[in-house]
Amino acid sequence: MDRVAEPELMLDAHQARAYASADFEEPHSRFIDLLKQRLIDLPPNGVALDLGCGPGDISFRFVRTFPQWSVDALDGSPAMLELGRRAAERSGLETRVRFHEASLPRDSAPSRSYDLIFSNSLLHHLRDPEVLWSSTRRWSRAATLVFVMDLIRPESRGRASDLVDRYAFSEPEILRTDFHNSLLAAYRPSEIRDQLREASLSHLEIEVVSDRHFIVWGPIPSVNQPDA
């Protein structure tokens, strides 16, 4: 099944609220667990960059798990960022998770480089996947750690519908439709390997971790270390 692109930004306020209220406990907890397991050299403190943060649930989970870290959380949707800022204030995390509106690759992050760059479910929204990988290189330095998790495009629309029924059976129809569209827009591991090679990031590991998710992870090498 060929990829079917979807809108890059979730700009509608109603859609953003529905997304923010959805039950992502299992995949978001899994994101943090996998990050902890794979990035065993993560230092005890630092500043992370969250690319495509949405309403911030991953960033909130990250700083609760790693209490000496803070996060600059970037997204291009004002509706998502407003929900994230409100949630940060309610939970007292507004000084540790800082939300910034930014459209990639045009805009800048608050810092020139970061100790960790992570992203959850941004890649499948991008018409040009190079945007994610070039942004990762742009804000990294030697030994910056990278962790990306996203969906895998299934082999058919029927399989996509099966995954929606299995994992979003109790969600509102707007979210079921979003999930289905996201599966159709996702990339496959072979495509991601090509993307990493073209971005000179093929030293990063790629791993399928469920029937619908992959992760990319590892450190950025020093500038004089050749890409694999």
Q: Could you tell me what each predicted segment is?
A:
Residues 49, 57-106:
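Class I SAM-dependent methyltransferase SAM/SAH-binding core
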Residues 126-136:
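A short, conserved alpha-helix within the catalytic core of class I
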